[in-house]
Amino acid sequence: MSTHTPPSSATPTSGQGVRPLTTADIRKAKGRQRLAMLTAYDYTSARIVDGAGADLILVGDSLGMVMLGREDTLSVTLDEMLHHCRAVVRGTRHAMVVADMPFMTYETGVRDALLNGARLFRESGVRAVKLEGAGPVLPQVRALVDAGIPVMGHLGLTPQRVAEMGGFKVQGRQAEAALRLFDDALALQEAGCFSLVLECVPAPVAEQVTARLHIPTIGIGAGAGCDGQVLVLHDMLGLYGELSPRFVKRYADLAGMAGEAVARYAHEVREGSFPAAEHTFGIDDGQFEAFMAALDKRGCRQTPTGE
């Protein structure tokens, strides 16, 4: 895989010099440039991720754990996803924003998938949705694609089915399971997915699946043989310490830095060194004297301070 012509250098078409990446750009990246994808859950994080040059932003249902403090992703609602997706879209100019369809918003049938997918796509402004699994949800994938809603697939460890899988375990370690994963990947490609996430899959298996697909794969715990990589932003920045998956590389310790900053702020507030003169606003001497004279005229005295 070469390193020329990244999607992020696509010819700008907007008046401000950038344009949003499309599914066509993502497809064209296969075999040309690895794709960088990260999660974002609000306007500020989207601005950071987009401004740093990520190709795709995933508004994942992982927000249930990372942002809302829940134990898993299963309780995240469509309304919650819409709330976060809108904020992310507002903070993004170039990266392609993809939204997870929450648990039980598509598994119950084609009609539900279309109604919920259309609402998520139309009301939030995301440019694609992501569904987990294959088999039973293939009709939903086809229906969404036929309706004009781009779909990203997700195979391997699928967090919405973690209970069924017996926990967070690597998938595809047996030959039969690896072949089943490959067949599912082909089925999702044929159903119209423009790309595919492979999560917690042995690296050699993910590499071979990637080499036999026409659509790009994006790995998370699936080795360097995928066409791109995705991580949870809060994991790679050291902001979320409840879980520490093996596949996460921590690029910063922002939780530590933030904790030190907050502690320093609290200390300065308590000792009276913040705010300093440069952080405050003054008043004309004459106006202040007039203000004090008015207070004295009213007989307003200072309240005694505590011991």
From Swiss-Prot:
The active site is at E199. GO terms for cellular component: cytoplasm. Keywords: Cytoplasm, Magnesium, Metal-binding, Pantothenate biosynthesis, Transferase. Pfam families: Pantoate_transf. It catalyses: 3-methyl-2-oxobutanoate + (6R)-5,10-methylene-5,6,7,8-tetrahydrofolate + H2O = 2-dehydropantoate + (6S)-5,6,7,8-tetrahydrofolate. 3-methyl-2-oxobutanoate binds at D61, S62, D100, K130. It is an enzyme of class 2 (transferase). The keyword Translocase does not apply. Mg(2+) binds at D61, D100, E132. Its EC number is 2.1.2.11. One of its GO terms (biological process) is pantothenate biosynthetic process. Its cofactor is Mg(2+). Binds 1 Mg(2+) ion per subunit. CDD domains: KPHMT-like. Pathway: Cofactor biosynthesis; (R)-pantothenate biosynthesis; (R)-pantoate from 3-methyl-2-oxobutanoate: step 1/2. GO terms for molecular function: 3-methyl-2-oxobutanoate hydroxymethyltransferase activity; magnesium ion binding. It is found in: Cytoplasm. Its main location: cytoplasm. Catalyzes the reversible reaction in which hydroxymethyl group from 5,10-methylenetetrahydrofolate is transferred onto alpha-ketoisovalerate to form ketopantoate. Belongs to the PanB family. Homodecamer; pentamer of dimers. This is 3-methyl-2-oxobutanoate hydroxymethyltransferase. It comes from Nitratidesulfovibrio vulgaris (strain ATCC 29579 / DSM 644 / CCUG 34227 / NCIMB 8303 / VKM B-1760 / Hildenborough) (Desulfovibrio vulgaris).
